């Protein structure tokens, strides 16, 4: 529970989430439930004790040693998803939680390559997640966007085939998929491994983002920008390059910061080391997000509260964060105006009370 006096303000503050992986919302309970339903053999507890029980798995999530350590569990976790209904159920579970945390707009990543590699059709994944998005829009009043995310640990050829399949399915023009991103292992694979895909997508007007500057140094960020990304996911190591940070601020490039994820994956030792204050002072736009909440022990409100407890931000500083989150969302001007009005109303209410 958030200990900040601003908890009620933060809970009710209209939020936009830009960095959450739907596959990162598979809770330990859902992993065991779907494994039984779909007759999936989880790793043997004799050699992988974390899979002895729901409780053991959740406890292991608190002990990740690195990004790659987490990714091993992440990819095991998504292996239980087999049917369209599984993907829809997962998305719907996330949207319900996000809505309860005050999210009004959500842009969510999904990882088709990994599912394809285990024999799941692309259309099964997309149709399931799309159904979850539509239900959230219909029943919760959220606006949603799907971002197709390439993974850096698989060959570029598989990403190219996936991109061509999405194009052939007319998923970008029909707004089933609203953009492209990349994630997974940052350090190791070539920084520019998706250069040709991003060049093609940029030429077609497809929105681009990229995970960079989480474990990798600032050159990973500059490479992503060179390839056409207009949003950077994580990006906390941007502070190591003042010149690049000034460019990011000047060009209005938003970072999608995930504080609790950074702590769990040992990119920083504590939330206090996430450069929130430095970004605010430098005029760098950022949103605050949950990343893989089932694995990192917190959804978006938990991240907001952790930031508040670490930095003691003012209501007006939170207003800047919330408004930047809206203005840099992939939504039309009418929706932006609607959300900005909700933020203004909320701030005015709490400012008067204060």
Curated annotation (Swiss-Prot):
Protein name, entry field: Adenine deaminase
Binding site for Zn(2+): 19, 21, 211, 291
Cofactor note: Binds 1 zinc ion per subunit.
Annotated InterPro entries: A/AMP_deam_AS, A_deaminase_dom, ADE, Ado/ade_deaminase, Metal_Hydrolase
Cofactor(s) this protein requires: Zn(2+)
Family designation: Belongs to the metallo-dependent hydrolases superfamily. Adenosine and AMP deaminases family. Adenine deaminase type 2 subfamily.
Entry annotated with the keyword Secreted: no
Cellular localisation: Cytoplasm; Nucleus
GO annotation, biological process: adenine catabolic process; hypoxanthine salvage; nucleotide metabolic process; purine ribonucleoside monophosphate biosynthetic process
Keywords: Cytoplasm, Hydrolase, Metal-binding, Nucleotide metabolism, Nucleus, Zinc
Disulfides per UniProt: none
Annotated substrate binding sites: 292
Signal peptide: none
Statement: the UniProt record of this protein carries the keyword Zinc: yes
Function as written in the Swiss-Prot or TrEMBL entry: Catalyzes the hydrolytic deamination of adenine to hypoxanthine. Plays an important role in the purine salvage pathway and in nitrogen catabolism.
Pfam families: A_deaminase
Upper classification of the organism: Eukaryota, Fungi, Dikarya, Ascomycota, Pezizomycotina
């Amino acid at each position: 529970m958030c200990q900040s006096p601003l908890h009620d303000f933060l809970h009710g503050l209209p939020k936009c989430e830009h960095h959450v992986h739907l596959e990162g919302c598979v809770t330990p309970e859902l992993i065991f439930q779907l494994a039984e339903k779909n007759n999936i053999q989880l790793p043997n507890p004799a050699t992988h004790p974390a899979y002895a029980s729901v409780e053991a798995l959740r406890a292991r999530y608190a002990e990740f040693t690195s990004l790659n350590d987490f990714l091993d569990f992440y990819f095991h976790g998504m292996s239980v998803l087999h049917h369209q209904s599984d993907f829809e159920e997962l998305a719907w579970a996330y949207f319900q939680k996000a809505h309860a945390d005050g999210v009004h707009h959500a842009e969510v990543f999904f990882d088709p390559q990994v599912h394809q590699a285990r024999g799941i059709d692309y259309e099964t994944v997309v149709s399931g997640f799309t159904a979850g998005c539509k239900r959230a829009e219909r029943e919760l009043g959220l606006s949603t966007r799907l971002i197709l995310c390439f993974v850096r640990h698989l060959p570029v050829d598989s990403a190219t085939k996936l991109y061509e399949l999405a194009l052939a399915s007319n998923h970008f023009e029909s707004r089933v998929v609203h953009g492209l991103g990349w994630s997974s292992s940052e350090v190791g694979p070539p920084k520019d491994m998706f250069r040709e895909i991003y060049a093609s997508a940029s030429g077609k007007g497809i929105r681009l983002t990229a995970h960079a500057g989480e474990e990798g140094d600032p050159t990973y960020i500059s490479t992503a920008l060179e390839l056409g990304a207009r949003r950077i996911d994580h990006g906390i190591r941007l502070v190591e390059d003042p010149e690049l940070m000034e460019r990011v601020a000047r060009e209005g490039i938003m970072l999608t910061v995930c504080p609790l994820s950074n702590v769990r994956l040992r990119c920083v030792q504590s939330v206090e080391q996430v450069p929130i204050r430095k970004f605010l002072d430098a005029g760098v736009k950022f949103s605050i997000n949950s990343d893989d909440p089932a694995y990192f022990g917190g959804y978006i409100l938990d991240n907001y509260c952790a930031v508040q407890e670490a930095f003691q931000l003012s209501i007006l500083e939170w207003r800047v964060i919330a408004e930047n989150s809206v203005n840099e969302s992939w939504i039309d001007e009418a929706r932006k105006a609607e959300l900005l009005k909700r933020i203004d109303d909320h701030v005015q209410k709490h400012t008067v009370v204060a």
